[in-house]
Amino acid sequence: MIAKLTGVLDSSGTDWLVLDVAGVGYLVFASGRMLSRLPTRGEVMSLFVD
């Protein structure tokens, strides 16, 4: 199971984001609350997966 991802924010939508981790793009579905707190595209971020 994946517990944490750290990478570059590639893109995001109304209920998802793509996090580029070492060249692999992870599609992560997330709440609007979490998505409203995202950094700018291209910045490094970490997220814990529940």
Regions found by a protein language model. Give the residues of each.
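A positional/architectural concept
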Residues: 1-50
